[in-house]
Amino acid sequence: MAAKVEPFWIRKTLEQLDQDEWESLCDGCGLCCLQKLEDEDDNSVYYTRIACKLLDLKTCQCSDYPNRRDSVPDCIQLTPGKADEFKWLPRTCGYRLVSEGKDLPLWHHLVCGDRDAVHHERISQSGRMLAEGSVAEEDWEDHLIFRAG
């Protein structure tokens, strides 16, 4: 009987992942691409339902991922070296979970094999986001959906 091989996200550290493994941790929820507001009093980060101008509102995928930082200079690039900063990511985020030594959820495409499960389980904001250009920045506070952490 062959020994069971643990999935790469269990048996490897973030630093040991190759680029394809790293990218595959993304569940495609798009939550990290929502505009966020920071409370000046306690530094809490709040997610809005307002999507980055490059985020496809239905698929929750970046429309220009390879060149995103050219169009959106403040786009945050997640890397294994920044894992200690992942607390602002949603608790369901594959990057955050693996950085905390946790397993991926059953709906994650690496576990279930279905990239649409994140939408079927309503983890993503697909169909519930607003385009960045449709809401004045001073009105973003009216569209808060949850607090990070």
Curated annotation (Swiss-Prot):
Pfam families per the UniProt record, alphabetical: CxxCxxCC
InterPro entries: Puta_zinc/iron-chelating_dom (IPR005358), UCP006173 (IPR008228)
Protein family: Belongs to the UPF0260 family.
Protein name as it appears in the record: UPF0260 protein PFL_1499
Organism: Pseudomonas fluorescens (strain ATCC BAA-477 / NRRL B-23932 / Pf-5)
Lineage, broadest ranks: Bacteria, Pseudomonadati, Pseudomonadota, Gammaproteobacteria, Pseudomonadales
